[in-house]
């Protein structure tokens, strides 16, 4: 519901007679009536006018972003969206978005806006919700802005699709705790004073650092890395020490991103829409911790559309990877959640990024068959009896395919050859 113009360029001198708490009461009423008529369906409604507590009933967005008289000059408005979205998260409104492309202004020259459009899409892919929207009948489909812009927009959108298992796990955390997915740096690193001056970058969950380019013509980005070791997510074998500012390359096809050493990132295949496939292989990217430490992630899943998640109908799959002097010990924990089960069989895929290539792999003490990448990927969505691994020294990855039976398994990747 749109209660008035709200693009930061003009505000009415007199209010229209509605209070913000009137809006939240309206959204509460709409949610209750929807659920009354659809007792096992989730409601989705969105507003920019509400009151404290709106997260119980609706989602927010930042209002109409004004591009100005010339839409190609909307860089400042795009940059402003990051601190606004972060502020919303701090206000316990974890699910928010902005008008990706900037709402206001006619687009008369699509090629002239291609760079700005690309950066909008790249930044918007890391909104908790992503929504491309422009006023009137102005079309903003990616292919209108030229072949390069379309290609770059497609890559950003597909990246978000791949990250949906990661995002959905953090959506559950937001539901339980109020912690937002899109986080100011200081929320994760409150003791580091430098993080309080980083309003052009943010944490996406606890593992990923995202620094979108928001300046016209920029092909690099000044990024602050807090404590720890950070791996360039666009070049996953390049690592940097933390507690430093650095300038990273950011051509038009690149979103500056870093993953913290000691992280596990679950991913799904790219799809045309989120539930195109009811069950699919989940890939866990593993960036091992330093020797003697371990990496953990607990994947959250539920049916996605009904209210079963409120009744305990969900499951978690805990994954742990310990780094030892002998190699890596991967533990797939027992799947928890008796009230929800997968709608079909699937494989779990693991990709460990390592320069120390294991020579032997054991599953629960028994040697695993070694194969090549092609064989490992073959029929992974239809064949659920194959357990195999593939060390790839050239790519610096150690790959594993494991049928998901919901049980605990210990996989040892050993740096030396052993005979069993």
Kindly give the residue locations of the regions a language model identified.
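Soluble, non-transmembrane domains of envelope/secretory-pathway proteins that act on or interact
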Residues: 240-280, 286-288
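Edge strands and adjacent loops of beta-rich recognition modules
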Residues: 268-339
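Solvent-exposed beta-strand/loop surfaces of large extracellular or lumenal domains
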Residues: 233-252, 362-397
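Conserved small/polar residues in nucleotide/adenosyl-binding loops
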Residues: 418-420
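Short conserved micro-motifs at the rims of enzyme active sites and ligand-binding pockets
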Residues: 57-58, 106-110, 131-132, 221-223, ...
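Short, well-structured beta-strand segments within conserved domains
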Residues: 328-330, 361, 404-415
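Surface-exposed beta-strand/loop patches in extracellular or lumenal glycoproteins
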Residues: 217-226, 338-357
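Catalytic-domain carbohydrate-binding cleft regions of carbohydrate-active enzymes
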Residues: 1-254, 259-260
């Amino acid at each position: 519901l749109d209660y008035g113009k709200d693009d930061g360029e003009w505000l009415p001198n007199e209010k229209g007679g509605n209070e913000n708490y009137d809006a939240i009461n309206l959204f509460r009423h709409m949610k209750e009536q929807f659920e009354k008529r659809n007792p096992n369906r989730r409601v989705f409604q969105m507003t920019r006018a509400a009151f404290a507590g709106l997260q119980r009933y609706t989602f927010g967005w930042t209002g109409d972003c004004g591009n100005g008289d010339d839409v190609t000059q909307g860089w400042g408005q795009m940059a402003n969206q990051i601190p606004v979205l972060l502020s919303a998260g701090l206000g316990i409104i974890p699910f928010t978005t902005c008008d990706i492309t900037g709402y206001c202004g006619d687009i008369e020259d699509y090629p002239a806006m291609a760079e700005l459009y690309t950066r909008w899409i790249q930044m918007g892919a890391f909104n908790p919700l992503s929504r491309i929207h422009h006023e009137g009948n102005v079309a903003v489909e990616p292919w209108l802005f030229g072949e390069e812009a379309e290609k770059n927009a497609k890559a950003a959108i597909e990246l978000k699709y791949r990250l949906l298992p990661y995002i959905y796990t953090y959506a559950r955390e937001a539901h339980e705790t109020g912690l937002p997915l899109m986080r100011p740096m200081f929320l994760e690193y409150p003791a580091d004073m430098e993080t309080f001056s980083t309003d052009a970058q943010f944490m996406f969950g606890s593992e990923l650092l995202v620094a979108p380019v928001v300046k016209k013509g920029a092909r690099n980005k000044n990024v602050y890395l807090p404590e720890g070791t950070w791996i360039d997510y666009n070049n996953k074998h390049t690592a940097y020490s933390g507690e430093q500012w650095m300038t990273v390359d950011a051509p038009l096809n690149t979103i500056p991103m870093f993953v913290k050493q000691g992280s596990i990132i679950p991913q799904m295949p790219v799809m045309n829409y989120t539930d195109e496939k009811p069950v699919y292989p989940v890939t866990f990217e593993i960036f091992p911790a330093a020797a003697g430490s371990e990496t953990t992630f607990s994947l959250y899943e539920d049916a996605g559309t009904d209210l079963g998640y409120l009744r305990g109908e969900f499951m978690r799959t805990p994954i742990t990877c310990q780094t030892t002097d002998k190699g890596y010990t991967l533990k797939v924990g027992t799947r928890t959640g008796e009230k929800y089960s997968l709608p079909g069989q699937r494989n779990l895929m693991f990709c460990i990024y390592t320069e120390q290539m294991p020579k032997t792999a054991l599953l629960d003490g028994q040697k695993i068959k070694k194969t090549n990448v092609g064989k490992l990927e073959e029929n992974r969505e239809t064949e659920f009896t194959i357990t195999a691994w593939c060390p790839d020294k050239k790519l610096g990855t150690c790959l594993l395919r494991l049928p998901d039976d919901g049980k605990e398994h210990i996989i040892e990747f050993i740096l030396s050859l052993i005979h069993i």
